[in-house]
Amino acid sequence: MILSGDRLPSVACSGVLVIGDPHVGSRRPGRRKDVVWPQAVLGKLERCVAIANERQLAVVILGDLFDRPVETDVALKNQLIRVLKGFDHRPIVNVGNHDIQHTMLTDGDSLALLGLCDVVDVVATSAPVTEVQVGSRRIGIGMTPYGQAIPTDARGSFSGVDLRAWFTHHDIAFDGGYPGAVPPFAVEGCDLLVNGHIHKTQKSVLAGRTRWMNPGTITRQSVDLVDHVPRAWILDESGALEPQALPFESNVFDLTGRVVDAADASVVAREVESAFVTLLQAESATELKRSGDGSIVRDEIEAKFAQDSTSEAVRAIVRSLLGEAVERHARS
């Protein structure tokens, strides 16, 4: 079903399997080398089904179940439905930015169809969602979709629970972040906040009593995730997240033109970060769409290159990533 403030019945389970941003889509990401796509993604979800059912776990998907709001490949949607219906506990899915064409979930989005057909329970509005009984402890679960305000106080959301966990899909500044990212903050009455959206696993941050965590995506779409290990995570009764291995191939990206001497890695990393901070400061997503081919952003970056005497290796990396960003905006 689609939840807009409704609460699901409480369930007894051995924990909650947390699955980060699957990005299921029929289009193979630009530098992935997979001969057949998206079997790598579906295979990870099938492994998640096995883990959840073997260990009697409830299931939460952190958002971006789909890579595009409208998935046109009917066969792929049927395959995905078949996988998702394999869970003993129906997955609860947060709404991510890739799941929606507008600011909120609508009937035109593929994710809405899965909710209406009871394949998954989709959380469309920020609210408390359900309670789970894990051993002797009761855990309250709430969610905030992409673009909606994360609550600052969760004390009135649940009564009689031992732990409150909230799930979000936002740009959070775990490691300092970029312009526009929200620093972790204390949410009154909330013990754990688990975020999607950011694709790399982040170190947890404690703000007041609220521990913020970001497990990362299970689908590596871009080369900046070449070292990211896709995992699912089990939320236990203590509020800890335990990593679970998922099947993945290490050599899945075409790195032509992207390989840099290892001795220069730290310098390259700093220069790339500096260039992208400039990019994000210079252009909003709206302006990127307005420029169409990314020319406005490209001019800003080239000016930054000239100002900082940026190496050719870093210039090649940033230009390639900018090209990928423009392509993704064109498809969205």
At which residue positions do the language-model features occur?
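Active-site neighborhood of phospho(di)ester-bond hydrolases with catalytic His/Asp-centered motifs
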Residues: V18-G20, V59-D64, P91-N97, D121-S126, ...
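Conserved catalytic scaffold of divalent metal-dependent phosphoesterases
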Residues: L80, V95, D99-F185
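Active-site-proximal beta-strand elements of phosphoester/diester hydrolases
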Residues: S14-S26, R137-G147, R164-H169, W212-G216
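Core catalytic region of metal-dependent phosphoesterases/phosphodiesterases
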Residues: I2-S4, P22, G30-V129
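Catalytic metal-binding/acid-base residues of hydrolase active sites
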Residues: H23-G25, L65-F66, D73, N97-I100, ...
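Binuclear metal-dependent phosphoesterase catalytic core
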Residues: V129-E131, M213-L279
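Conserved beta-sheet core of the metallophosphoesterase superfamily
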Residues: I172-G239
